């Protein structure tokens, strides 16, 4: 796993529901919501209903942000998988989940419910992380050699760690460029170019949110691998919808989760009400 997390915000008050933009990481993730409503995702700010994915959901690798319903307080646990781990954990090529969310039951069948029940019985966040770690390690250990990440992709991922130069990754893979792209997309879920782009963004985001970040956006841009500050700003806006300076001022509690302004939802709601009124007139 790349990382595991758990939230244990138990409270007696009714949950506060809002929306947030989840920023892309290029990696797949698995999340269990153990209290409150099911996980709901939205196609955009104009989507007032959303789509429910139940209380256990898998998010495939993606290079674009998405909108979800944020519920606070919440009790949840999840994991972000290392690039190339999707097929070992879920039994399907990463490219089949790219840019998608699916209910875990579609991939694990009845095991999804059993794991969810076990997590519900765990009394602490630490115990939930321990349980989920065990489940994922067992599934990875039980996977067949067929699901292992090809050595060419492993070499490329190591070369791309800290670099956005796809040519370096292709050269390190030791196979032809076309074969490299096909192998990489199957194992990682994104093409080498898209994966390198989103990981460069994540490096920049890491620098931007450090306790003592590098002075100046130009310094951050160069440290992350961008050509210049203008290039960094364009990419940052494309991924987040806001400028780096605006992101800093918002100071989200979790760097990959950007709260959606309530006004955007209210505007969409009024637009929908006007449309409904026109239709009934």
List where the protein language model places each region.
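Catalytic DNA-binding helix-loop module of base-excision-repair DNA glycosylases/AP lyases
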Residues: 179-188, 196-199
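Positions that flank functional sites
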Residues: 200, 236, 252
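Residue-level recognition of oxygen-bearing side chains
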Residues: 165, 200, 231
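DNA major-groove recognition helix of helix-turn-helix
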Residues: 184, 196, 236-237, 248
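Alpha-helical bundle regulatory/interaction domains
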Residues: 1-177, 187-192, 206-227, 243-281
């Amino acid at each position: 796993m790349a990382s595991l997390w758990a939230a244990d915000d138990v409270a007696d008050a009714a949950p506060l529901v809002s929306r947030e933009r989840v920023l892309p990481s290029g990696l797949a993730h698995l999340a269990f919501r153990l209290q409150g409503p099911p996980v709901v995702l939205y196609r955009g700010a104009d989507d007032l209903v959303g789509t429910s994915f139940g209380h256990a959901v898998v998010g495939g690798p993606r290079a674009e942000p998405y909108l979800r319903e944020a519920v606070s307080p919440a009790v949840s646990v999840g994991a972000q998988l290392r690039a190339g781990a999707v097929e070992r954990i879920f039994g399907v090529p990463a490219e089949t989940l790219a840019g998608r969310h699916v209910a875990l039951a579609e991939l694990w069948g009845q095991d999804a419910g059993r794991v969810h029940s076990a997590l519900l019985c765990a009394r602490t966040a630490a115990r939930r992380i321990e349980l989920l770690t065990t489940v994922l390690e067992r599934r990875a250990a039980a996977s067949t050699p067929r699901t292992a990440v090809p050595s060419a992709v492993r070499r490329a991922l190591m070369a791309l760690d800290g670099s956005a130069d796809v040519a370096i990754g292709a050269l390190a893979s030791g196979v032809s460029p076309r074969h490299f792209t096909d192998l990489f997309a199957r194992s990682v879920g994104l093409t080498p170019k898209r994966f390198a782009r989103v990981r460069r963004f994540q490096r920049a985001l890491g620098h931007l949110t450090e306790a003592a970040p590098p002075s100046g956006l130009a310094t951050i841009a160069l440290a992350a691998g961008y050509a210049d500050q203008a290039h960094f700003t364009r990419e940052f806006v494309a991924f987040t919808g806001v400028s780096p300076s605006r992101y800093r001022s918002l100071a989200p509690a979790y760097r990959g989760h950007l709260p959606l302004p309530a006004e955007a939802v209210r505007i969409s709601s009024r637009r929908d009400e006007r449309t409904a009124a026109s239709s009934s007139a």
